[in-house]
Every structure is written in C-alpha cells, then in structure tokens.
Amino acid sequence: MDLGRVVSRTGHEYSSAPHREIPVELRKLQDDVAYWVTHGTFPPDEIAVRFHHRLVLIHPFPSGNGRLSRLMGDLLAISLGQDPFTWGADSLKENGRQQYLDAVRAADKGDLKVLIALARVP
C-alpha cells in the first residue's frame, strides 16, 4: 500500500492510504479477507483483527476510523461464529487507550500478537 502521512489530533504521525487509493485498498482488503476465510489462512479472531488493523491503516474517513474499524472487526468476528471483541473493555476509557494505540503501532510494524491479545481482554 502506498501510504500517505497524517497527523492526529494528539500530534502522532501515522500512515494512511492516499485519498485516491482508498477504494482500491478497500477492495484489496475485501478480497484478502474473503481468501483468508475461504482457505482458513488464520484463526477467526486473527482474521477479524487483521481486518480491523488494515481498515485502520487505510483510514477511509477524516475521523472515527478506530471506532468504525473496531465495530467492523466485531461484526466480522460474529459472522465467523465468535463473540464480539472487548478491545480492552473499560480500560479504553483511561490508560487503556494508550495500550490500544501501542498495540496498533506494534501491528503497524508486523507484530499483531499484542493487538490480538488486547482484543479479548475482559
């Protein structure tokens, strides 16, 4: 994915798909998820978390991408016969938000283990 640069409200810089490539990247994501599900490439939770993470990276909207991506990840998990994720539950309200952002950044670097684990924290 050819990534653009965006600076968040908190001053953190992150990469996202350039605006003109968002539809293409969303289609690639749809195709990848269909392949993963059809071929059992990953366990259901990992498929849903990978989907969530890629959607965050694509960043299709000016704001609300994290919330939308978590909701979409939950819906995918449910469609795969899993319970919705907790995403750290109540901890997201306080210091857990930083844990979530750190887990997303680790996933940005290829380490999805922390984000997968956080998704199921009660």
Give each language-model segment a name.
Residues 1-122:
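FIC/Doc superfamily catalytic core
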